[in-house]
């Protein structure tokens, strides 16, 4: 199975900050990767697909990039509403696999 190693597991940042999180695939090529945001009690929301394509309606402060088997989600100019857990999903190789998640908290 392809393991998606996500880091960090938690992150605390201030409003207006730029934050990044990464997922690294343990193996494979041409991995199709999505990023999701999940808030407590809510269904996951697709942010980015194809590693870097922003889903319709998602603010442009979210961006995704890839370098080989390393994938990065960046949030620029952090807002209160961005407090959530973020996770990646590879859906190229069966079984599809998720990263462990990054819990983003806002520093007060």
Curated annotation (Swiss-Prot):
InterPro entries linked: Ig-like_dom (IPR007110), Ig-like_dom_sf (IPR036179), Ig-like_fold (IPR013783), Ig_sub (IPR003599), Ig_V-set (IPR013106), IgV_Light_Chain (IPR050150)
GO biological process terms held by the UniProt record: adaptive immune response; immune response
Segments for region (Complementarity-determining-1): 24-34
Record Gene3D superfamilies: Immunoglobulins
UniProt-annotated stretches for the region Framework-4: 98-108
Region listing for Framework-3, in residue ranges: 57-88
Annotated stretches, region: Complementarity-determining-3: 89-97
Keyword Disulfide bond among UniProt keywords: yes
Cystine connections: 23-88
Domain of life: Eukaryota
Residue numbers spanned by region Framework-2: 35-49
GO cellular component: immunoglobulin complex
Transmembrane segments: none
Keyword hit for Nucleotidyltransferase: no
Further remarks about this protein from its record: This chain was isolated from myeloma proteins that bind beta(2-1)-fructofuranosyl moieties (inulin).
Protein name: Ig kappa chain V-V region W3082
């Amino acid at each position: 199975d392809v393991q998606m190693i996500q880091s960090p597991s938690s992150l605390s940042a201030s409003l207006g900050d730029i934050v990044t999180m990464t997922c690294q695939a343990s193996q494979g090529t041409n991995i199709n990767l999505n990023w999701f945001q999940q808030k407590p009690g809510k269904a996951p929301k697709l942010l980015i697909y194809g590693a870097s394509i922003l889903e319709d309606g998602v603010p442009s402060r979210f961006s995704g990039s890839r370098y080989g088997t390393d994938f990065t989600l960046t949030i620029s100019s952090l807002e209160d509403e961005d407090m959530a857990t973020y996770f990646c999903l590879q859906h190229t190789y069966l079984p599809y696999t998720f990263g462990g998640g990054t819990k983003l908290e806002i520093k007060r």
